[in-house]
């Protein structure tokens, strides 16, 4: 997915800003946090974060959850380069492994309702003829 932040700001400007941040804030990493397109989760109020190097991915997810006021029954997932980073990993480790060439770490978040409110399955929409070739007695 293309980053809206990248679309709005030229590479040179992003790189200069990330370099300035790295020089000024040695104990923080610059992170751009954006919602996955077409996700059914609220939009975050700000995209740019200076994240402490000792913050875990799980703690950062908590920050995102609070900023978007996500109800407890909704799940949230974050992705870095299409990878779901381990919850216990430090942001600094993820940054070193996945930072963009402009110096920012790009984090995408998405959500789906996985707790409590499951939609009923409409059995009338299933093509039962596909199951006629199964010989369950052999198994």
Curated annotation (Swiss-Prot):
* UniProt entry tagged with the keyword DNA-binding: no
Propeptide positions in the record are: 117-139
The gene designation is ATG8
Q: Give the lipid-moiety residues, type Phosphatidylethanolamine amidated glycine.
A: 116
Name the keywords, alphabetized.
Answer: Autophagy, Cytoplasmic vesicle, Lipoprotein, Membrane, Protein transport, Transport, Ubl conjugation pathway, Vacuole
Q: Where is this site: Cleavage?
A: 116-117
Q: Gene3D superfamilies from the entry? A: Phosphatidylinositol 3-kinase Catalytic Subunit, Chain A, domain 1
| UniProt function note | Ubiquitin-like modifier involved in autophagosome formation. With ATG4, mediates the delivery of the autophagosomes to the vacuole via the microtubule cytoskeleton. Required for selective autophagic degradation of the nucleus (nucleophagy) as well as for mitophagy which contributes to regulate mitochondrial quantity and quality by eliminating the mitochondria to a basal level to fulfill cellular energy requirements and preventing excess ROS production. Participates also in membrane fusion events that take place in the early secretory pathway.
Q: Which organism is it from?
A: Scheffersomyces stipitis (strain ATCC 58785 / CBS 6054 / NBRC 10063 / NRRL Y-11545)
The record's account of how the chain is modified after translation: The C-terminal 23 residues are removed by ATG4 to expose Gly-116 at the C-terminus. The c-terminal Gly is then amidated with phosphatidylethanolamine by an activating system similar to that for ubiquitin.
| Bilayer topology | Lipid-anchor
* Pfam families in UniProt: ATG8
The record's Gene Ontology cellular component field reads: autophagosome membrane; cytoplasmic vesicle
Q: Where in the cell is it found?
A: Cytoplasmic vesicle, Autophagosome membrane; Vacuole membrane
Q: What is this protein called?
A: Autophagy-related protein 8
Q: Which family does it belong to?
A: Belongs to the ATG8 family.
**Gene Ontology biological-process annotations:** autophagy; protein transport
The principal location of this protein is membrane
């Amino acid at each position: 997915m293309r980053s809206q932040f990248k679309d709005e700001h030229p590479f040179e400007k992003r790189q200069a800003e990330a370099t300035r941040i790295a020089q000024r804030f040695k104990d923080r990493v610059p992170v751009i946090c954006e919602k996955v397109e077409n996700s059914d989760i609220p939009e975050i109020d700000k995209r740019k974060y200076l994240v402490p190097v000792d913050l875990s991915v799980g703690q950062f997810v908590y920050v995102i959850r609070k900023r978007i006021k996500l109800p407890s029954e909704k799940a949230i997932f974050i992705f870095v380069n299409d990878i779901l980073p381990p919850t216990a990993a430090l942001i600094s480790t993820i940054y070193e492994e996945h930072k963009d060439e402009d110096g920012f770490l790009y984090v995408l978040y998405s959500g789906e309702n996985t707790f409590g409110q499951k939609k009923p399955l409409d059995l009338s929409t299933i093509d039962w003829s596909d199951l006629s070739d199964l010989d369950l007695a052999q198994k």
